[in-house]
Structure formats: C-alpha cells, structure tokens
Amino acid sequence: IQSTSMDQGSLSEDSMNSFIRTLIQAGIWKNKVPKQTARDKDGMQTTVKKAKAESDVIANQDITLGFQPIVSVNAELLRQQRRFSSPRVLLSENTPLEPPPLYLMEEPMVLNRTSRRKRSTEGKSHRGEYSVCDSESRWVTDKTSAVDIRGHQVTVLGEIRMGPS
C-alpha cells in the first residue's frame, strides 16, 4: 500500500476505531509466532515453532525499543472501506512509478486553499537548482587585472588602439 500524503483531520476518531476493529477481526494485527525450519535425522525439512517464552521476551524488547512490526493489509479489505477514500491519499497494490511531483508542494494554493495567492514576478521557484557561477556585487578598485571565463588572471589594457598604427 502506498500513500502519498494524508489529511489526518478528515477522519473522525470513531471511523478510525471501526477501521482498526475491522483489521483486527480480519486477523491482520494478530501476533503470529514465527516458524523456524530445522532438519530432522533423515535430512528432511520440518517447521518448528519457537517457544512461547522466547517470543514473549522478543515482543517485550520490541516494545521497549519502539519497534512496530510492518503490517500487510489486504487490498480487498480497503476496497470494502469506501468511506476512507480521499483525494489526498492514493491506496494501491503497486508501487508508484515516479515520486510525487514537487511543484504541488511549492504552490501556495495547493497547500492552503483558503489563503489568497500572491503575485510573483519571478515565476515558479526552482528549489535545489543553483546557477553555474555565483554572482558577486562589490566595488571594483583595481581596474588593471581581472579573471577571465576560464578562471585565469589577466591584465586589463588601459587603452585599445584601433586602425593603422
């Protein structure tokens, strides 16, 4: 399931609680004891469940470390919950082909629809893009030397004679 963004204020607490209850009833949040494969005397693979005490110790360590297991949600369960569909959230079984567009994050009208849009003389901002060379604004006191476009120090001529000499 991929979600691009979420408007958390749009869901009521009761609807979230009922959704969580549905997930629990579907058996998604049940703690399943992991299986371990072992070989018996004949070399055949057998599945062995870990001891309950060991899994309780691991679960207690996970809680103290703040670890939350990754939960897999069946897409059919989400289709049944139509009231949770939102134009701001995209639920899909497939991973997105490209990241979300950044220009939507820069537009003030998209972020806050109640605010008025300011006029911008520069156009759209290009965050993360820099020019090839940075400009410097300072007074030139020495007019006899300069730096050319290749970065070499050159001497500036005071006079340029043109024509036959």
Curated annotation (Swiss-Prot):
Name the domain of life. Eukaryota
Q: Where in the cell is it found?
A: Secreted
Show the propeptide residue ranges.
Answer: 4-119
List, alphabetically, the SMART domains matched: NGF
List the GO molecular function terms.
growth factor activity; nerve growth factor receptor binding
Output the Pfam families linked to this UniProt entry: NGF, NTF3_N
Describe its function. Answer: Seems to promote the survival of visceral and proprioceptive sensory neurons.
In the record, the note on similarity to other proteins reads: Belongs to the NGF-beta family.
Q: What is this protein called?
A: Neurotrophin-3
Origin organism is Acrochordus javanicus (Javan wart snake)
Source gene?
NTF3
